[in-house]
Amino acid sequence: MTAPLKAIDGSADLPQLMNDLAKRARAAARVLALAPAEQKNRALEAMERRIRARADVIIAANAEDVAEAKAVGVTPSFVDRLTLTPARVAAMADGIAVVRGVADPVGVVTESWQRPNGMTIERVRVPLGVIGVIFESRPNVAADAGVLCLKSGNAVILRGGSDSFRSCRAIHECLVEGLREAGLPDTAITLVPTRDRAAVGLLLSGLNGGVDVIVPRGGKSLVARVEAEARVPVFAHLEGVNHVYVDGAADLDMAKSIVLNAKMRRTGVCGAAETLLIDRASQDKIKPLVDMLIGAGCEVRGDEAVRAADARVTPANNEDWDTEYLDAIIAAKVVDGVDGAIAHIHAHGSHHTDAIVTQDNKVADKFLNEVDSAIVLHNASTQFADGGEFGFGAEIGIATGKFHARGPVGVEQLTSFKYRIHGTGQTRP
């Protein structure tokens, strides 16, 4: 077991601390890459057990974070993202249990073939190495990222937001003790031990080759900064400007249920719907949909056609179509059928998650095929944009790019591959 790195208040020693942290993580990554699945699963079981046993400690630490955040006047949606309840801590532990049950991807031969000269070539899954995860208000990311990286054989450096520092520290202690119980390096999951914001810039630099990939989890400004400054590859999504399109062939009751859930289940998550598109051929659905949303406490900002259906709708401006509210607000617009919906999403979407509600499978197929988003849904809520709902146990983020990983980034997406070649003495002519 290595000596813990001490937290510091100033930045004078920060570069040295961060480089030491990366070196220890790299050494741990070499051990994890060869660790058997059974040993990793023992660590995960111990982590789950400790999080359940220390739920009160975690919630007490979180209460201090929440009180501090409220004192500086953050938004209700921010408080919701920051808050840990007994149910959310239990869900965190449940997620670890699911990850434990996921097949270990490391060492899996995904393809194998024999060449005419007799050589056998295998494509094999391998860990990425050291992953840096930078996140803001959600303390559960510490657990999700830690266990996913462990299962996939990667070491991880966690840099949580200053708002969730106490919560993350309490969660991290459970993870580290789980590693120790299983005989794995406790530096396999490292929490940056300072709130100093300069740590983010150092992590983005790659720490002299100590970090292989960065995953940001947070708002638009954080992700934009990461993508602009990172000197290593990034798995990132910008905002979730997600749409629900209610087609002319939609069942009204189904549409109401899906729209309400997509917007109001949890308004502060990246899978929340931010724009409602309604087929001009089904304008009779506008009034009941708007009435339902306003009745649930959601502000509706609409175009002229939507405002004509309900005087309580406020005017939408051009910025509304591009806004991730993360709040009880939705923009609403009438479009000319599925083609109009697709055109609007192409112009204003963020390639995250978009849904269609329709009983016409042909129209649904067109939407699913032509909308260029990481997740597209037919007759289901956008709030299913979550690794746990995909059966991944948890997710380290939802990637909206097209390289390496796209959609929920789970265990399998945190691996790369290498080629193993078996010969019998072949030489190249």
Curated annotation (Swiss-Prot):
Sorted UniProt keywords: Amino-acid biosynthesis, Cytoplasm, NADP, Oxidoreductase, Proline biosynthesis
PROSITE patterns attached to this UniProt entry: PROA
PANTHER family: DELTA-1-PYRROLINE-5-CARBOXYLATE SYNTHASE, GLUTAMATE SEMIALDEHYDE DEHYDROGENASE
Pfam families from the UniProt entry: Aldedh
GO cellular component term, pick one: cytoplasm
InterPro entries in the record: Ald_DH/histidinol_DH, Ald_DH_C, Ald_DH_N, Aldehyde_DH_dom, G-glutamylP_reductase_CS, Glu-5-SA_DH, GPR_dom
EC number annotated for this UniProt entry: 1.2.1.41
Gene: proA
UniProt protein name: Gamma-glutamyl phosphate reductase
Domain of life where this protein originates: Bacteria
Pathway the protein takes part in: Amino-acid biosynthesis; L-proline biosynthesis; L-glutamate 5-semialdehyde from L-glutamate: step 2/2
Subcellular location: Cytoplasm
Catalyzed chemical reaction(s): L-glutamate 5-semialdehyde + phosphate + NADP(+) = L-glutamyl 5-phosphate + NADPH + H(+)
Alphabetical list of CDD domains matching this protein: ALDH_F18-19_ProA-GPR (cd07079)
Family label: Belongs to the gamma-glutamyl phosphate reductase family.
Biological role stated in the UniProt entry: Catalyzes the NADPH-dependent reduction of L-glutamate 5-phosphate into L-glutamate 5-semialdehyde and phosphate. The product spontaneously undergoes cyclization to form 1-pyrroline-5-carboxylate.
Top class in the EC scheme: oxidoreductase
Single GO BP term: L-proline biosynthetic process
GO molecular function: glutamate-5-semialdehyde dehydrogenase activity; NADP binding
